[in-house]
Amino acid sequence: MPFIIYFYIMGHCISIYVMNKSELRSEKINSVLENKTNKKEIKWTELSEGILATTHIPNIREFGKDKTIAKVSTDYFGGNGHQEAKLFVNNKKQYDKSSEFDWSVRPINDVLKSMGIVAKDGQDEFDTVGLGKYRLNSDFK
């Protein structure tokens, strides 16, 4: 148990999909955010700035039609690690980068900027949408 607590404080390891809430049809938004699900629906977590996040999209090819969706992941512990991001527009990959071998690259911020997120004063795009609060996939409920 102490390791888990220590990791939670020192680490950041997520692998999620993010999209703008505006990409969903308006009649679906409330049922999605209230997590009223059947076997085909997706459980979303609402972040700041109109961004939705989920750990799983069962049929990404079908769901991704006519949408902009990013797949982002982090793997950090005690400051060391990397992040990756891919951006898909209508199922076509528009961006695919990792900071694993080039720490000057900030793929998640790049993708969030492409999705219209503007960093607030003193924050980057990652913290502006609130991703810093979610350390593990299990934090997305």
What are these regions, as identified by a protein language model?
Residues 40-141:
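Charged interaction segments
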Residues 3-36, 140-141:
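Short, extreme N-terminal segment that most often corresponds to the first beta-strand
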Residues 2-3, 7-8, 67, 115:
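Residue-level marker of intrinsically disordered, low-complexity segments enriched
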